[in-house]
Amino acid sequence: MAAEALLSSLLGLLFLGLLLPAHLTGGVGSLNLEELSEMRYGIQILPLPVMGGQSQASDVVVVSSKYKQRYECRLPAGAIHFQREREEETPAYQGPGIPELLSPMRDAPCLLKTKDWWTYEFCYGRHIQQYHMEDSEIKGDVLYLGYYQSAFNWDDETAKASKQHRLKRYHSQTYGNGSKCDLNGKPREAEVRFLCDEGAGISGDYIDRVDEPFSCSYVLSIRTSRLCPHPLLRPPASAAPQAILCHPALQPDEYMAYLQRQAESKQHEEKVTEEVQDTDHQVWSGSKAAGAPPKKEDVSPTKEDKESEFWKMLQEPEEQATGTEEAQAGEQDLNHEAAADPAPAPPTDFQNNVQVKLIRSPADLIRLIEELKGAEKGKPSVRQEQPGDDTTEAPQREAEAKGKGGEPRGLVEEEDGDEEEEDEDEDEQQLLGEFEKELEGMLLPSDRERLRSEVKAGMERELENIIQETEKELDPEGLRKESEREQAILALTSTLDKLIKRLQESQSPELVQKYKKRRVVPQKPPPSPHPTEEEPEHRVRVRVTKLRHGGPNQDLTVLEMNRENPQLKQIEGLVTEVLEREGLTAEGKIEIKIVRPGAEGKEEDTRWLTDEDTRNLKEIFFNILVQGAEEANKERQRQSELESNYRRVWGSPGGEDTGDLDEFDF
């Protein structure tokens, strides 16, 4: 809005300059209203001054701002040659004339338009009526705005001289001798203007607007696609605004002082640049001379240090690997039964860091827990002594069990089982924590998953073997019952599942997320909770409401358009088309208010939006969704530069000033 106000004010000054004497303006100009109706202009106030009075061209005009700053503005070349080009334009059209193009409207239905209280009815070539409607019925008198009298003749020489219709690109008809006007006592009259609208081919002809410039004198604008084939009525191609360039006009002494200041400023910049370059060269030369000798002296020690570190790094892994292989060999000798067992061996990637123990009895489980406790308290010797303990403690416990001859064997096993259950509840967390810490420090998520599956399968097989061996050793009636056997299996399986579940939950979320990203496993998309019948179409939802005064007290009521209304579907289609064409998604909420008077009657009897409103919505959506932010940014920057240049006042040498910001108002 500020740019438009500035443009109009400067154009006013520009046109006043056209009327000034020739010795002030440097040329003679004339105000061409036809040019203003056809062309668009954009004012540009440049910061580069010129010497005033030097240009004698006819396309230069001198104007003055409110701050008394004079400008020389040069009209664009298109404005100079506008009149000649328009006269030389000869459209090569061999089709039907304008009356023939509009003749089908005679047999078409009359056009209706409701504006405020009144409804207007236009019947081509017959008459124009005005009346009030309530509940689809005419209430009160019917006024005639006029009967058909004549149409504009495009071949008449007098009509050609006016060029009004040619410039505004419309065809007109005259309607007169209507109902008597109560204000001036004259019969009502109207002018009907037909304009090309290519979009009207789908919705049909329509009354765009009804104006009353004078009392009982009306102008109806009708949009139709029937006139678009004619070159004289087809809308011209939109072009960029013609720029009017305005330079500050200085007196000769002011201009010479300006040139001198520019030369001094340029010399100062060159001098500063040379000083900076000299300083950089000196600093670079000094640093290069000082840094060269140390580099030569340090070359050989650095290489020797790097080589020694490299050989140390190679020797350390070999020593570690040798120690690990020896430990593994000793463990395999002591646990030959475990090697012969069909349980799966751990992956080869973990043979240097992971030790796998087979738990074949509750006593082995207790010993493993004690070893882990000792490792936590800072006793690394527990793990080294483990193979020996395995061989010595097992016979001792068996001897103690056999020594108790007064008790049955089944009772001894039950008492041992109770003690083991109590110890298991206390030490389960400790065992699981140590196991998880070692896995987190040594394994990647993918390796953990593989190791976990193999350990789980091996433990399940070992549990099954333990149950089978126990059945053989115990009394035939001990666990032969199916119920007892199932209970034992469930107890062992639940413990195993609990350990595996806790292990899965304790994984680092970040590592799990990275592991999931690396895996390329196709997953089915989750089903939508509320499937729609046509998902792409229902991505965009448009809601149209209308405010209307009604009832005896003229209360304000709110009406909402029905979802089945075809006009609502058309609006949703326009929004979807804009979004798909620009590659945007329907996110967020946009509210657009169209302020217009509502019509009386029920919802189904009234039209919510005119055809023009529906067509304009597409442009509104495009401006909001696509061009809004970028264009607003550019316009804001251009406006700021324009105002800054306009406020600058060029005075005596060194005395430039700016206008008062409080007085300057766009």
From Swiss-Prot:
So which residues have sugars stuck on them? N177
Organism lineage: Eukaryota, Metazoa, Chordata, Craniata, Vertebrata
- Establish whether keyword Glycoprotein is in the entry: yes
Report biased composition (Low complexity) as residue ranges: 320-332
Q: Which Gene3D superfamilies is this protein grouped with?
A: Mannose-6-phosphate receptor binding domain
Q: What is this protein called?
A: Protein OS-9
Residues reported in the UniProt entry to bind a mannooligosaccharide derivative: W117, W118, Q130, D182, R188, E212, Y218
Q: What does this protein do?
A: Lectin component of the HRD1 complex, which functions in endoplasmic reticulum (ER) quality control and ER-associated degradation (ERAD). Specifically recognizes and binds improperly folded glycoproteins as well as hyperglycosylated proteins, retain them in the ER, and transfers them to the ubiquitination machinery and promote their degradation. Possible targets include TRPV4 as well as hyperglycosylated HSP90B1.
Q: Where is this region: Disordered?
A: 261-356, 370-449, 505-540, 631-666
As given in the record, the signal peptide range reads 1-30
Oligomeric form and interacting partners:
Component of the HRD1 complex, which comprises at least SYNV1/HRD1, DERL1/2, FAM8A1, HERPUD1/HERP, OS9, SEL1L and UBE2J1. FAM8A1 is stabilized by interaction with SYNV1, which prevents its proteasomal degradation. OS9 and UBE2J1 recruitment to the complex may be mediated by SEL1L. Through this complex, may interact with ERLEC1 and HSPA5. Interacts (via C-terminus) with CPNE6 (via second C2 domain); this interaction occurs in a calcium-dependent manner in vitro. Interacts with CREB3.
Molecular function per GO: carbohydrate binding; glycosylation-dependent protein binding; protease binding
